[in-house]
Amino acid sequence: TDKTLVQCGVVAKVTDKMDEVGLVWDIYSGVLPNPTIGIVKEGLEVFQHSGADYLIAIGGGSPQDTCKAIGIISNNPEFADVRSLEGLSPTRKPSVPVLAIPTTAGTAAEVTINYVITDEEKRRKFVCVDPHDIPQVAFIDADMMDGMPPSLKAATGVDALTHAIEGYTTRGAWALTDALHIKAIEIIAGALRDSVAGERDAGEAMALGQYVAGMGFSNVGLGLVHGMAHPLGAFYNTPHGVANAILLPHVMRYNAEYTGRSEEHTSELQSRQCIS
């Protein structure tokens, strides 16, 4: 997790319950946005020293991704160099059990097969794709997301919307992923503004919408927005959702001109009143 979630009492909602049933726990709260190789190493050391049986990831995409990397390396120590996990990871053993508790409605890291780490020396991000890293349990509870400031709700919400749009328009899309992405766009487009304004029902809808988008794009991948957003995050430390928000309109216009399904996409979304 990160220091902010500890200081504002979000982590205590979990650890207090663990105390009630007599579970022993330790904590690593050094995660920062765009987690680095160094952060993964620090978290791994804390986990190994604790002797714990499983990991709990509390936070947005950065704590989730950090926890995934720690879990994978713990059971596959031959990949202690995180860089060796880039791309399609050749691990043989499942991750240490991970319980994911997202506190933002955006990344869907709790259901995807990938995680993103920043190489602080080379100032680049790299994506690790590994079916072994999916958390065993995900607690998607809108109550854990209530404390997000409006700016974070907006940024993470656009990340979720970008997942849905890119998953829908990617060349690998097919009938099942189209169904997931269209539904995700419908949910997110109808809830994002009200969620930022603080409406409870909209917050619950965003929690669902980002999850559905994650189930979709985890099967087909993403596109140019994320391809360009990752370098922005690595080089300028731009928050991921903000980078997506900057790039998404431009990539959508590019895709509309150069991809064969743009009219089909637009017609479908207009019929569902997702766009005007």
Task: Please state what every model-predicted region is.
Residues G38-I140:
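Glycine/threonine-rich beta-strand-loop-alpha-helix active-site module
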Residues G106, Y211-N244:
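Glycine-rich phosphate/pyrophosphate-binding beta-alpha loops
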Residues G43, T66-I70, A164-I165, I188-A191, ...:
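Buried hydrophobic packing segments
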Residues D16, E45, I72, N76, ...:
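Short, well-ordered alpha-helices that flank and scaffold nucleotide-derived cofactor binding pockets
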Residues T1-Y54:
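ATP/NTP phosphate-donor binding region
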Residues N114-V220:
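Carboxylate- and glycine-rich phosphate/diphosphate-binding segment that chelates Mg2+/Mn2+
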Residues F235-E263, S267, S276:
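Gly/Pro-rich interdomain helix-loop hinge
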